[in-house]
């Protein structure tokens, strides 16, 4: 029947589009990260709003952005070397746990109404340092999450779609949250979202990596 053939064709096309999701480890990763990325974008927008509300300074917003980005630029070579040498799963657990702690400290400072601009900038530097290691770890771990090497490109495409979707959804939601509960609870929610990521990573069953030959850090 033509209708049956059309449905089979659509089903086959969907399987190709989402073929990386056949891998259990990748499903866990994408599920945990989808929630966390949305709330992370909520924190970014809420933090910018808090800084501007408190300081009424565009320059302060510039300092905040600079503080969050400069560590990744300076530490990229070192981070890549560490990712090659150390267990990627445990590196990701460490970076996510540290990011969770950063969010909780930020939430406490704002909710207790004791936060200052320079404390917030310092915490942005801390998060930038964490992200400098976190981003290459994610990229390297992706190869271990798919069942077939040919699914890697699809996994990267789905990950990019998820990231861009989070950029759209997070800022859309955070405006309502700021009005209703304030910036501090947005930061608290971000910290709690990392629990989903840590649970997903803990549930993964990854094959042991072959032992790497000892190498110097920069060559």
What does each of the following model-derived ranges do?
Residues 2-219:
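Alpha-helical transmembrane-bundle signature of multi-pass membrane transport and export proteins
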